């Protein structure tokens, strides 16, 4: 696990394993999408019934609800298959915080956890991946960050801008969380002054 300070306090780097299928933040997003999808599906089916038949009765309400529920169930099964079988409940993120901003590379590979267990709820320490297929990079400039939110129990810091969440920063342990929190407080304070 690379948790380097690059010789000075101007840069912090580390790797973190991020659970997918058991991550509370991802599950919350997924649940929200499922509720919105179910309501939209139910509403669209009722509008279609009204358009084609001119009225909506109680059996139509029930039938639309069953179809909306079945659709959500299908999406949930697909989510479980992708999360636990395709992605093996995790991916690796390489974070770098420096004077220019926050940088994150999401690396698609099999995370080699340095702590035992397959079913993690929070981010966890991982060894540096030797090989990987793909990686997606995201950069957030400190000028775009207006504030950040702490989710201490999950060891996550959320960078916020004018349009909402810019980046989630996952920390593999409490020590790294405190280091990153101090760094963010210093950077945001210096950007405001």
Where are these regions (language model features)?
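N-terminal membrane-targeting/pre-transmembrane regions
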Residues: 1-62
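Eukaryotic phosphoinositide-binding membrane-targeting regions
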Residues: 19, 132, 138
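Short amphipathic alpha-helical segments, especially helix-boundary/capping motifs
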Residues: 57-58, 75-77, 119-122, 154-158
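Canonical hydrophobic alpha-helical transmembrane segment
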Residues: 65-83
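Conserved beta-hairpin
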Residues: 78-134
